[in-house]
Amino acid sequence: MNKKKIMSILVSAFLITNLSSNIIFADIKENVYINQYSEGNRSQPIAEKLVPRSEIQASATSALTGEGPEKAIDGNTSTLWHTPWAGVDIQINPQSLTLKLGKTRNISSICVTPRQEGTNGMITDYKIYSGDDVIAEGKWKSDSSDKYVVFDNPISTDNIRIEAISTVGDENNKHASIAEVEVYELADTPVKLAESNNKVINNGNGGNYEGDISEISLLEEGTAIIRFTNNGSSLFSISNNERTNEHFHVYINGGAIGYELRKQSGNLATGSVNKALNAGINTIAFKAEKGKGYSIYLNGEKILTSSSITANFLSTLEGLNTLSLGKTDRPSGSNEYNFTGEIDFFELYSKPLADRYLKERTGETTSKDLPFPEGAVKTEPVDIFTPGELGSNNFRIPALYTTKDGTVLASIDVRKGGGHDAPNNIDTGIKRSTDGGVTWDEGKIILDYPGASSAIDTSLLQDDETGRIFLIVTHFAEGYGFGNSKTGSGYVEIEGKRYLKLLGANDTIYTVREGVVYDSNGEATNYTVDNNNELYENGNRIGNVLLSNSPLKVMGTSFLSLIYSDDDGQTWSDPIDLNKEVKTDWMRFLGTGPGKGHQIKTGRYAGRLLFPVYLTNASGFQSSAVIYSDDNGATWNIGETATDGRLMDNGDRASAETITTNTSGGVGQLTECQVVEMPNGQLKMFMRNTGGNSGRVRIATSFDGGATWEDDVVRDENIKEPYCQLSVINYSQKIDGKDAIIFAIPDANYPNRVNGTVRVGLITENGSYENGEPRYDIEWRYNKVVAPGTYGYSCLSEMPNGEIGLFYEGRGSRQMSFTRMNIDYLKADLLQDVPAANIKSYTTNSENNIYDPGDKISLNVTFDQTVSLIGDRTITADIGGKEVLLTLANSKGGSEYTFEGTVPADISNGNYTITIKGKSGLKIVNVVNKVTDITEDRNTGLNVQVGEEVQSVDKTLLQDLVDSTSNLIKEDYTEESWILYEKALEVANKFLVNEIAVQEEVDAAKPTLENAYK
């Protein structure tokens, strides 16, 4: 049969997705260099292994002393190979790094890591050689991301040379540098051992794998990849369901993504990382490498690497008999970590797959930045404090404050002894911004106690009347911190006056009175103490009372220190110890609620300065309170705690002084806190808490400026509280016509500190208390995740222009980040205008688009973004009035799906348009959880030919002739002539009704009929 070739009307396309790293492919045959995603994820699963650095020898055309070629293979990206400072013209005299590989190897890819600090010598144009043969060339971006060169066909070679053709930096094309090179060689071909698709799982049900796992259970290494909609608990597992603790699983829990390899005897390997997930579909890969360790990849990024020379993956577990999706199959009564959600696909391979492939595959679900509506502002985060500044590699506990003059102050713990809390050498640092947080000065230390003494957890406040700025901080002597703080104020009261207590040998008590040290009998000694806590004997310095080796030293308890500035934060006073005024002897710990204080603006207590604090009693039970001043900070008092008066289960009222965890009767501990003001001057204290139905923010109310608190401490069910410091401020302007507060905290369950979220709360009056005071409720009208991923302590401040500044811990103790946003941004629903995936094109796999009845037909449906298809993975096509069921056969790149079916056997020949019938039961969801509507019929714009193409036939003249003979009279003709006429008429009518009659037949019938009746 002759078939005419008909081209499809629409052409398929692939979604281009960006990874955090710039990964470059090198097509050796065509010498073309393109981003790996611009070809639509062409890679196939590949296993490769790193050529051991110990087997590589590096040399270079030239090198700077101390930065030789060996630095490029030392496994440390902080070191580098660098050409001499004298420089050469690289474009005339190219510089190169040569790696001798020890033996001939099949090289599959190379990863080049540029220098991580600065740009000098960073290579852009490059060539890569094997011997004298160019095996790759191209151009790299001038940034610090890893650069991959991937060979479609492995290169058999014993050496690799990387040549710099052009570079950037202080003097373009004068220097060359490389931080690290990794060379990968081909490993054994991976085998897909298990696969499962299209699972809808409800509370762990619906994800059982029925295949044989005997080979899987022996794996010493391998790779698993899973695509799913965002939900919690176990994603997939391999377990012995007859033992409580004999399993491996990969899970998500709140904001944590992790894995657990566990035996009856205990954990063999675990790891987790806090990372933000897409609202819709996500892709995770887990890789186990024997003798090396374990890795996790999420949405195009390698997020976790755990090294282990004993890593043997599943082979270390006994009796493995189940593979499950959406749960960990364990004996009855055990926690199976049940998952509810949808799993697009799961694949398990016998080998550790290539790092670049896993970034590519998981990168199919990389989320693009959402567009901002007009008027919305959100700046990219900048790190205010970074490792190496102020003599420290670690910082924590950000505080932020905007002064009356518009200066923004950012204070921080400068943790010189490491990222941990006290005991530690911790100073107080500060930076200033005079342009609303756009730029910052170089910063300085403003409080530095001697040795490893600590100043931890700062809080800032300015007196609007005097302009004086106060900073309070918790202070410990060397060797002490929250955990080992001793009960007591650190002072001794004598005749109504309180004096600093010093302890000598055998804890003999001394006191400091106007700088002179008195013994326990009240007699003056030869010791004196100056304002810097230096200890003197007969005028000779012999120590410092804050140091552990001093003959006399302060009590090992917490102290509250206050410093102040009268010049907008440029200079600061010496510290003043507030324990003398505010700490009582039943308190074991008294410390700041880090962040900021508050000055009451309205009502009977207007002008009062207050700082949130929290404290513990002798048993360690925590309670929240405030210290306050009514004389512009000259003297300070401490109010009752929010614990005092709370109703316990036994009907008694709690006392912060005596309550214990054993006697608390359902009353949880209240800890770090912040305070805001209601329209009438009433205070609301927001508190971190633990025990007693914790997990949500607690709010206390004060009618007397913080001196006492309402007995009922409200649990706000709207705000998760993962036992992390929170920040809340009053906003100066009305929002939606109402007074408002701004609130920030990780939006996660304990113990995860992830997904930094800023909320807008509108203050609404709702009735009154029994004392007649108005009752205010907070309507949390808007919220936005502004810092996905790791997010710890934070502090908010309103910028001079009305924007909101947020200073937060972005990555442990090393990344102290700052961002600005406006109210329009916080109010905007960024997802509202993000479209669901659209079908971009339809194509068929036929070269000529002509089919016979009964032929197989394939329809490719390409979306404009990555999607998952969940549910009934079929579509129905209408071809020539016949319904054709098409079933999903395969997919490519997450955006192109191929459906296959059969052309109906009873369809007539002809040219037909393909229409896709509307349907339900198939969910097409993207990374932001938007679902594509396919309930309406869709014209694909594709035409297909069934059978031979039928040429158009003109039957008009023949029909006219037949019609003209209808009035003939038989008697006017001879019998023989009439018979001839009837036969000719029969033939003519036959061709008129015959749909496949050709023009030649029709044309021949006309003269035959004419001759018959004439």
Curated annotation (Swiss-Prot):
GO MF annotation: an example: exo-alpha-sialidase activity
EC number, as in UniProt: 3.2.1.18
Keywords per UniProt: Glycosidase, Hydrolase, Repeat, Secreted, Signal
BNR repeat copies, ranges: 431-442, 563-574, 627-638, 700-711
GO biological process: ganglioside catabolic process; oligosaccharide catabolic process
Entries under InterPro entries matching the protein: ConA-like_dom_sf, FA58C, Galactose-bd-like_sf, Glyco_hydro_33_N, Sialidase, Sialidase_fam, Sialidase_sf, Trans_sialidase_dom3
SUPFAM superfamilies: Concanavalin A-like lectins/glucanases, Galactose-binding domain-like, Sialidases
Cellular component GO terms, alphabetical: cytoplasm; extracellular region; intracellular membrane-bounded organelle; membrane
Substrates-to-products reaction catalysed: Hydrolysis of alpha-(2->3)-, alpha-(2->6)-, alpha-(2->8)- glycosidic linkages of terminal sialic acid residues in oligosaccharides, glycoproteins, glycolipids, colominic acid and synthetic substrates
Domain F5/8 type C: 39-186
Highest taxon in the source lineage: Bacteria
Keyword Ribonucleoprotein: no
Active site: 421 (proton acceptor), 912 (nucleophile)
Signal peptide: 1-26
Disulfide-bond pairs as recorded: none
Family to which this protein belongs: Belongs to the glycosyl hydrolase 33 family.
Biological role stated in the UniProt entry: Sialidases have been suggested to be pathogenic factors in microbial infections.
Protein name (record): Sialidase
